[in-house]
């Protein structure tokens, strides 16, 4: 039995949900998202609640929990949106956003340029902080991970691109061997 899929999803007043065959479309003030519902799962809409119905097989129970989580993320995304904050830690590390292009100096001999997906917006409140926002949680996480991958934080000095809430496990530098 799936504990996640048993919980109904409440639909806010500002969100419109349309279920057509095996496609669910969710639209709100921030945008519109759609999702293909797996064959072993069905979604029923009753007023402002969505319930997930599924079979007895282990596969359909697992898909039901995943489907419920993804649809809930879609509803939150189109009503409130998601944000991720990245910090650039290191001497001379800075970022500048212009439209859909993010240009970063990360200690390489050349600036790193990253073009953001259409649904992801970027702001740089300071030179060492990048704020990404989107209504699509998956796309936002993918873009943030790709930016972080240019220079992941290293454990000795902590330099690199890190998430704002990420804690870097620090290591101690190797000590010179004492006289044998």
Model-derived regions, located:
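N-terminal intrinsically disordered, cationic/polar leader segments
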Residues: 2-133, 137-145, 149-180
């Amino acid at each position: 039995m799936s504990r996640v899929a048993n919980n109904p999803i409440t639909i806010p007043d500002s969100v419109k949900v349309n279920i057509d065959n095996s496609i669910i479309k969710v639209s709100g003030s921030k945008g519109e998202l759609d999702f293909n519902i797996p064959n072993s799962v069905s979604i029923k809409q009753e007023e402002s609640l969505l319930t997930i119905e599924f079979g007895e097989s282990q596969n359909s129970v697992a898909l039901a929990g995943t489907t419920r989580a993804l649809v809930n993320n879609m509803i939150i995304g189109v009503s409130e949106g998601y944000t991720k904050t990245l910090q650039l830690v290191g001497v001379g590390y800075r970022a500048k956003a212009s439209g859909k292009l993010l240009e970063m100096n990360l200690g390489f001999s050349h600036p790193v340029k990253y073009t953001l997906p259409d649904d992801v917006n970027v702001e740089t409140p300071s030179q060492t902080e990048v704020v990404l926002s989107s209504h699509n949680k998956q796309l936002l996480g993918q873009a943030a991970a790709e930016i972080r991958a240019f220079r992941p934080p290293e454990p000795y000095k902590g330099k690199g691109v890190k998430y704002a809430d990420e804690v870097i496990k620090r290591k101690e530098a190797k000590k010179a061997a004492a006289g044998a």
